[in-house]
Amino acid sequence: MTRSLRPSTKVLPGDVRARHRSMVLQHLFHSGPGSRADLARSTGLTRVTVSDLVGELLAEGLVAELGQEAEEGKVGKRGTLVGLRTDAFQIVAVDLRDDELLHGALVDLAGAVVEQRTARFTQPQGEVALADLTTFCRELLAAATCPVLGVGVASPGIVDADGRVLEAPNREWYDLPLAATLTAALGVPVHVGNDADAAALGEWTYGGALGGSLLVLTVGQGVGAGIVVDGALVQGHGHAAGELGHVTAVDERDAPDGPVGPPRPCACGRTGCLETVLALPALRRRVAGLDPEAADAALASVGRRLGIVLAPVVSALNLAEVVLSGPPELLGGPLRDTALAVIRERTMPVTSRGLQLRVTTLGEAAPLSGAAVLVLSGQLGVS
């Protein structure tokens, strides 16, 4: 099935050709090779327009002619198949979630990792962190074995549509034009997005998402969410949609000796946020030294709090699936099962019937995959 993220802005007359080009590439990306006639039928464009666009893409090396269609079931003259050259370009993808390490990869247009690298921050905040990131990107660019389409960066914090980091406290970045700064330093297009949004894009494009609406909950040093509804990434009026990690999950009404304990201070300055019980450091502390049965009970207690937080979101958005991105040994099993049961308890059947709650199939590479999609979408209109 051909699908793409729905444009978030109006398509102006001057953008029509780019939109048509995107439609052709989108079909080839998701549906595989087809003849010019097939492309015209599937996109609704005229054959003349498709032939013109295919000629342009052939000249750029983005597509290749693959020989004639098979004879079986074919009436009339066989067309020449055209396919996307997934090895024509590489993408530099960088994940900045880790407090100590930069994670990066060279990825082809199909999302396959060509090379993966890590580097340690000299200092994970401020201008030094930015300099470390720039050096890391240069090293990945130098390792590319074919032309680079662009650089995608999945950053913590609140990031606007222009790739400006409005606020990333753990990096001490505020109002930083990260995309523009890196583009000037590296000489290639750079696209920057929030790490949870990037994980949602990666799941949408490469992770086998079920339908038009999903939420990806990223669980690492912190907790965040990326949301796609009806094929559009939800960013909110302040570009801060998905900050579920800072919804209160434990408060003074909870028994101090109860399953999740008393509300704990959060890095945001408040207490009892979901992040204080669900972030990986908190989960690992909770199960440390416990036998399997007790560990399962501890994880189930966190799953209950997660379900309480997610239930109104599922009800409001009528999501098809919720995807947990993080270690499956902690997020799968009792935590996942309990969260799903609580969501169903607290919502009307019509809103949660058929809801899938699963752990990502992309593993720890979800934000890297999403960083690559930032470039695919920004440069080619493909997602």
Task: Annotate each predicted stretch with a short phrase.
Residues 68, 118, 170, 238-239:
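Short clusters of small/polar residues that mark proteolytic maturation junctions
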Residues 212-277:
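Glycine-rich phosphate-binding loop of actin/hexokinase-like ATP-binding domains
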Residues 102-106, 201, 224-228:
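Short beta-strand scaffold segments in enzyme catalytic cores
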Residues 1-118, 124-142, 146-147, 252-253, ...:
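ATP-binding/phosphotransfer module of carbohydrate and carboxylate kinases, centering on a glycine-rich
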Residues 195, 220, 371:
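Active-site glycine-centered loops adjacent to acidic/histidine catalytic or metal-binding residues
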Residues 30-31, 206, 220:
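Short helix-capping/turn signature of helix-turn-helix
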Residues 113-213, 334-345:
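Glycine-rich phosphate-binding loop and adjoining helix at the ATP-binding site
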